[in-house]
Regions:
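C-terminal catalytic "cap/lid" subdomain
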Residues: 1-256
Length: 256
């Protein structure tokens, strides 16, 4: 069984009770999964406490080299340990990783104005085999959006990008888990499945708009690239665990 790749948004990361319920359900069902997370809120809090500037360009955090030890500490330290603590409480055996461990992904630097900000490209087939072998021993990977390049330098990677790189590597289903339960139709009812054609029609009609347009296009691109289903769902959805345990994806599912 291919593992689920579950990417947690900032809102989902803070939903400790809901995550604990999810982890317990997945542990009981022995459903393998990989958690991918960022932690922008925690980074902002740390920078503010230390009176460091928080700057963004086109919505992306400027991450100077001198700030990377702090950013990495918040992401791969504070946020990762919180999630791993919940996993332990749920009876799981978590394995803390950064995005590039085991060569699971490769750093691809972005705009130099952003400093140490990068995208993630999928790693090697050997890396995929290593990860799956570790998971077969009962480990649950908890992967932060920190990367290390060939020179040993730290990079800040968008967590969505890390999740996509891992899903691409494994050809695995991907869930973007946030506080948004999925795509709604004109009557505000959840749309359970969307094809590229149907999604573009809803965008043209203005039913999908604003930030949801970005999420939908990202999900469609991910589904097309991985050839596996991709879902947008809410950690607060009461049907979340039932869907996963019955072999379905929650929220709105995008097919390639």
């Amino acid at each position: 069984m291919l593992p689920l790749v579950i990417k947690l948004s900032g809102k989902a990361l803070a939903a400790e009770n809901e995550l604990l319920t999810l982890f317990k359900a997945l542990q009981k069902a022995r459903r393998p999964f990989i958690l991918v997370h960022g932690g922008g809120v925690e980074v902002d809090r740390l920078m503010t406490d230390l009176k460091r500037d928080v700057k963004r360009i086109d919505g992306l955090r400027v991450s100077p080299a001198e700030d990377m030890p702090l950013i990495a500490g918040a992401l791969a330290g504070t946020c990762s340990l919180m999630l791993r603590g919940l996993a332990v409480k749920a009876g799981l055996t978590p394995l803390g990783l950064v995005a590039t461990d085991l060569n699971l992904s490769v750093v691809r630097p972005q705009d130099a104005r952003l400093g140490r900000v990068a995208k993630a490209a999928p790693g090697t087939e050997t890396a995929a085999r290593r990860l799956l072998a570790l998971m077969e021993t009962g480990l649950t990977p908890v992967m932060s959006s920190v990367g290390i390049d060939d020179e040993g330098r730290l990079w800040n990677i968008n967590a969505d990008d890390v999740a996509l790189a891992v899903a691409l590597l494994l050809k695995a289903p991907l869930i973007f888990l946030s506080d948004v339960r999925g795509v709604l139709n004109a009557d505000k009812a959840l749309i359970r499945e969307l094809t590229p054609h149907a999604a573009q029609k809803l965008i043209a009609e203005g039913i999908i708009s604003g930030g949801m347009t970005v999420k939908v296009n990202a999900a469609l691109a991910a589904a097309a690239a991985t050839k596996a289903p991709v879902a947008i769902a809410s950690v607060f959805d009461e049907t979340l665990t039932h869907c996963l345990l019955s072999g379905k994806l929650p929220g709105t599912v995008f097919a390639s």
